[in-house]
């Protein structure tokens, strides 16, 4: 039987091809734009923050104030490190060109490493160790971010050393678990080893759950799954608010600090995605989607998203992309793209390439690194979102 194709049929085929071609071209153009923005943001970070003194370290902010430390604290450094890691995953040779820079960041990162601590375990101090500084108290959340970055690098490269360091960090973090049953809401991982704080935070528990789940996926060791469940359950019991979002922290008397930061919503999204992956229980995926929906609605009101620090939003959006890798809902990528577009147009100084998202004349390393991460990840192929936090 012969098939007859009418003129209108031919036109329909040509039109569909044209639409597909236009869509593909638009996606490619968007990726190129994000790629260029990531590179420009990184170049500004290096130009204004990187210390060309052989230390492999950075400034805390630009312009520096007279009383500033010589180098940045560990948390900002780690985000510059992660920004560089994200750049190595840009398509083609562009990503590969950042491998020497990533090696440089790895050297700098180790200047914060301390072989001892309050719980007897090694980890990253909050400030560089001698000869670059005198170290500082360990923060469990700061260490968790590095652990998650090491997992990302392991998934990208298979480097066994990064996996080994992630395991060390996890051991440190769970050593910070509150074991005093006389405390209000006993349990939970403390925020820091510093003597001036005894808070147990969403951000010192949920990222550890995320790290534990990643380690369980890689090793199959139920030790990691057990701790992930323990920290997840404690946070849900004590810091999950009636609006479906998470409060910041709880003190030893049971008083709750009820600020709802964006990164404290993003990480639980990622944790639930990983629980779904390791258990196959769709309840976890539904929880992830519910938190994401509630967060996007909450931060979409009253310009709230732009009152959140960029370095909280980068973590928030990366976890939404991890959710997208599981449910294929592109609204998360669209929301991240819209945020990136607005920050680029509204809060960036085109003369310097620096961001001023808080309206001040100073740019922090945290801020610049966060926006570099956002543009870099948006330039990735969407199938790569599954390696994010």
Features from the language model and the residues they span:
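Bacterial N-terminal signal peptides that target proteins for export
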Residues: 1-11
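Short coil/turn linking the two alpha-helices of tandem helical-hairpin repeats
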Residues: 88, 92, 154-158, 216-220, ...
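Bacterial N-terminal signal peptides
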Residues: 9-19
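Boundary at the C-terminal end of the N-terminal hydrophobic targeting segment
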Residues: 26-28
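CBM-like carbohydrate-recognition segments
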Residues: 30-83, 87-141, 200, 260, ...
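Extended ligand-binding groove/face enriched in aromatic
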Residues: 99-218, 226
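Active-site cradle of extracellular carbohydrate-active enzymes
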Residues: 202-208, 212-216, 223-272
């Amino acid at each position: 039987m012969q098939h007859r194709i009418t003129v209108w049929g031919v036109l329909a085929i040509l039109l569909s091809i044209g639409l597909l071609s236009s869509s593909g071209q638009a996606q490619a153009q968007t990726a190129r734009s994000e790629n260029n923005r990531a590179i420009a943001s990184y170049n500004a970070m290096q130009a204004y923050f990187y210390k060309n003194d052989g230390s492999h370290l950075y400034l805390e902010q630009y312009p520096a104030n007279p009383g500033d430390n010589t180098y940045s604290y560990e948390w900002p450094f780690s985000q510059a490190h992660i920004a560089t890691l994200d750049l190595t995953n840009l398509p083609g040779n562009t990503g590969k060109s950042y491998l020497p820079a990533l090696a440089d960041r790895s050297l700098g990162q180790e200047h914060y490493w301390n072989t001892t601590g309050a719980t007897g375990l090694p980890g990253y101090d909050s400030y560089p160790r001698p000869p670059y500084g005198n170290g500082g108290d360990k923060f469990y959340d700061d260490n968790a971010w590095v652990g998650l970055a090491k997992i990302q690098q392991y998934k990208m490269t298979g480097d066994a050393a990064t996996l080994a360091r992630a395991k060390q960090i996890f051991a440190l973090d769970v050593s910070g678990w509150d074991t005093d049953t006389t405390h209000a809401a006993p349990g939970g991982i403390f925020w820091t080893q510093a003597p001036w704080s005894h808070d147990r935070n969403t951000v010192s528990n949920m990222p550890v759950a995320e790290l534990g789940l990643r380690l369980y996926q890689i090793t199959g060791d139920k030790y990691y799954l057990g701790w992930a469940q323990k920290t997840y359950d404690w946070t849900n019991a004590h810091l999950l608010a009636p609006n479906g979002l998470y409060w910041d922290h709880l003190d030893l008397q049971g008083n709750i600090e009820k600020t709802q930061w964006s990164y404290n919503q993003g990480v639980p999204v990622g944790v639930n995605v990983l629980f779904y992956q390791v258990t196959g229980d769709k309840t976890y995926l539904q929880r992830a989607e519910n938190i994401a929906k509630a967060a996007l609605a909450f931060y979409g009101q009253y310009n709230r998203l732009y009152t959140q620090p960029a370095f909280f939003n980068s973590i928030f959006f990366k976890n939404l992309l991890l959710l997208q890798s599981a449910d294929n809902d592109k609204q998360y990528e669209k929301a991240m793209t819209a945020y990136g577009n607005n920050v680029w147009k509204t809060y960036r100084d085109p003369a310097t390439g620096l961001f001023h998202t808080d309206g001040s004349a100073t740019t922090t390393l945290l801020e610049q690194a966060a926006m570099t991460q956002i543009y870099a990840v948006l330039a990735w192929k969407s199938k790569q979102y599954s390696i994010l936090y």
